[in-house]
């Protein structure tokens, strides 16, 4: 512990090393699993599941340490402010993470595909595939015999069939949950713990419903639409963006579940509930990303 009692400095920890190891296993496992899609037998998922076990194990121990230290009164206002800034910078890094993906999508739609179709200043590239027509989504790829495009896309079918469009229900779930988490936090600030708990349960329920609908959407894409990772640039960007977003929703739902369990256990007060506030910020973030 630091000799300066005004700012608690934890003892050195090996947890960041284990977290880095878990993330390494995740990258290797996820890449291997994707490469092995379609193979009759593969053990790549074992590596992926191991990475999840390591990551969640480290997070459990790490967060437990932070909670115990806070309950013992080791944290000052200055340190609590450090947590606020830390969460803010973490969300900013996530914004940049998704910004890179949106930038890639924009580049493909505005430049790469038109160039391949004979449009724009670099239209000479269309000599490679003279029959290719630049449209988005790309349903017919330049080399469609080798890399067949999707048979159907995820575009909105029209207002009259909106109720049959899974992304509509996904959006409804996330937007609603963003409101319910705000109501939960407002109830806690007013000391209404029963309402706080109820709104938290509603929020995490909507979050996991979103995850279920996302899985159903992926099943429909693969089984009935021909929309796969190999269905050209449209399939690649679709699963890249929605897949990483879905992962973040899972992470956010688990965080809010932990906050809910802690809330039922008596944690948080009207003035001391940063864990809940941080989870709420993160949840609003994934909501905005989905709408974009």
Language model segments and positions:
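...captures the hydrophobic TM-helix bundle architecture rather than a specific catalytic motif
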Residues: 1-292
């Amino acid at each position: 512990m630091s000799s300066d009692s005004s700012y608690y400095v934890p003892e050195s920890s090996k947890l960041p090393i284990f977290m880095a190891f878990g993330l390494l296993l995740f990258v290797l496992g996820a890449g291997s699993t994707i490469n092995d899609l379609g193979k009759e037998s593969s053990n790549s998922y074992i590596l992926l599941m191991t990475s999840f076990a390591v990551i969640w194990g480290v997070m459990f121990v790490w967060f437990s340490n932070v909670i115990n230290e806070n309950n013992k009164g080791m944290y000052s206002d200055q340190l609590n402010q450090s947590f606020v800034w830390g969460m803010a910078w973490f969300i900013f890094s996530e914004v940049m993470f998704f910004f890179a993906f949106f930038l890639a999508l924009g580049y493909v739609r505005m430049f790469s595909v038109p160039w391949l179709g004979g449009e724009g200043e670099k239209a000479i590239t269309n000599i490679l595939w003279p029959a290719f027509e630049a449209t988005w989504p790309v349903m017919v790829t330049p080399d469609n015999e080798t890399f067949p495009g999707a048979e159907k896309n995820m575009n909105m079918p029209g207002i009259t069939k909106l109720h049959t469009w899974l992304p509509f229900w996904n959006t409804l779930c996330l937007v609603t949950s963003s409101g319910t988490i705000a109501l939960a936090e407002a109830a806690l600030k007013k000391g209404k713990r029963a309402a706080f708990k109820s709104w938290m349960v509603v929020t995490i329920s909507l979050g996991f419903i979103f995850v279920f609908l996302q899985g159903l959407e992926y099943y429909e894409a693969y089984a009935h639409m021909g929309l796969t990772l190999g269905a050209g640039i449209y399939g690649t960007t679709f699963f890249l963006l929605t897949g990483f977003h879905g992962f973040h929703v899972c992470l956010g739902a688990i965080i809010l579940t932990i906050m809910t369990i802690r809330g039922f256990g008596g944690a948080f007060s009207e003035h001391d509930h940063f864990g809940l506030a941080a989870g709420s910020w993160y949840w609003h973030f994934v909501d905005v990303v989905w709408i974009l």
